[in-house]
Amino acid sequence: MKVYILSILLFFSISSFSQTKSVRELALELSIRDLKMSELVNITNDKFSDSIDKAKFIYYWIGFNIKYDYKLLEPKSTLREKQNAYSYNFYPGQIFVKKMAVCYGYSKLYEWFMNKLGIESTIISGFIRDERNHYVELDSDSEFSHAWNAIKLNGKWRLVDSTWGTSLNEGVADFYFDMPPERAIISHYPKNSTWQLLKKPLSLKEFNNSKFINPIWFKIGYSDIPQMKMDSNYYYFVFKNNPNEDWLVNLMYSVDNKDFYNLREVKTIIQDEYTILRFYKSIIPKKTFFKVNLYKSIDNIDYSLIHSDVINFKM
């Protein structure tokens, strides 16, 4: 009887949530409650009828409640010790109680909830690149191995990374739910190319030659992936204008990917809805690394560096 009464109280408590709250806000409000896994499944089904909302709700709940287990990154004295420390990541129930995981554990827990909610899901294994590691080398980049999910909604596979969705920055967290394949491949390289979900999957070489772009580029208003074009005399770095005109793009180059320098004699051309940075090919070495920094106007007078290493690529 006590269990029945508690279930009724929990139902009415959850039902009292404002109908105007977003899925994210509901997940945040619910994160302070001590729930069983089955209760969270029931609440999700009671609160949402749309599968996309269910998948997003669990994504946010995991982001708010499961912390990354950085201790597992510390060196272990033996392989057995490392395996024992890592083993809980294979068991969703242990992850749920422990409230900690590494990437495989995040994807395993997310997969468990999707299965309980009747949403087809799979775990994708592969590699990631970020600000620390712009280029993936399969033989030496084991520390950048990663796991994420694909879920099938309305007959379409969608990419979800609940590990990277733990960011408290709403814009960054949103980026990793239902990632468009052409944006997911910026940072996520699956071992099975099928899970790139691209019409023409990239080889590892093509992946490493493509641009690494921090999601902040899209969050602050840029909408496309910049392109480097050329003719006999010039390079042209081309991107769509940002509706927020306070931002300024700074393109730098390096021969060793360590020391970067500002380009000389850059001409900025505004053409229709695009910005073009034009510079002489003759000043660029044959093998060159580029990076983009973002400056923002302060009081419409001076520009301050706000985000560095936002885009990295090589030629």
Task: Report each predicted region and the residues it spans.
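Secondary-structure boundary elements
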Residues: 20-102, 112
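Alpha-helical and coiled-coil interaction segments, frequently adjacent to or embedded
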Residues: 168-315
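Bacterial Sec-dependent N-terminal signal peptides
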Residues: 1-21
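Gly/Ser-rich catalytic serine loop of serine hydrolases
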Residues: 103-107
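A generic secondary-structure signal for well-formed alpha-helical elements
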Residues: 12, 62, 66, 70, ...
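Hydrophobic/aromatic-rich core segments of domains that either
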Residues: 108-184
